[in-house]
Amino acid sequence: MASPFALLMVLVVLSCKSSCSLGCDLPETHSLDNRRTLMLLAQMSRISPSSCLMDRHDFGFPQEEFDGNQFQKAPAISVLHELIQQIFNLFTTKDSSAAWDEDLLDKFCTELYQQLNDLEACVMQEERVGETPLMNADSILAVKKYFRRITLYLTEKKYSPCAWEVVRAEIMRSLSLSTNLQERLRRKE
């Protein structure tokens, strides 16, 4: 029979693992995937951004949701997952496929899909550990509203090449901010 001290130590380690640990291990390649995604999105540009200055628009990116200092990892991962999911949804539409080079778009969407799988596995891992709340509903709603504004803008601009270029630049910015958040979270580990 194990000593009471040994059992106590096992219980402390297990409880600390579920409550003290961030519980989620993104693959080491995840940061590289983020950078590759940004590079692909940069390559997708078809027209000069300077020719679309009149079409610029403030979509109201929910910056506070990506601050990182206010977040614990589990809710942050859920918000990142929602961001990537919304980007994936935006770039897999019929209107999107008409706007971009098909090969680059396929590679970009494949990278997004891989990131979604990584983040999904992370969210599932958090659920198994029993982390709550897994999702910050207000933050997720802010991300959804942000993408709703982007979609409305594209519709109003009739999915013009300049509208897509403005959206591409906006998504580059949001992906860059999400990459920064992920790196801050990784450093906290």
UniProtKB/Swiss-Prot annotation:
SUPFAM superfamilies registered for this protein in UniProt: 4-helical cytokines
One GO-annotated biological process of the protein: natural killer cell activation involved in immune response
Disulfide bond entries: 24-122, 52-162
PROSITE patterns with a match to the protein in the record: INTERFERON_A_B_D
Pfam families in alphabetical order: Interferon
Family annotation (CDD domains): IFab
UniProt KW keywords: Antiviral defense, Cytokine, Disulfide bond, Secreted, Signal
Main location: secreted
Subunit composition and interactions: Interacts with CR2.
Family: Belongs to the alpha/beta interferon family.
Name this polypeptide is given: Interferon alpha-1/13
Organism phylogeny: Eukaryota, Metazoa, Chordata, Craniata, Vertebrata
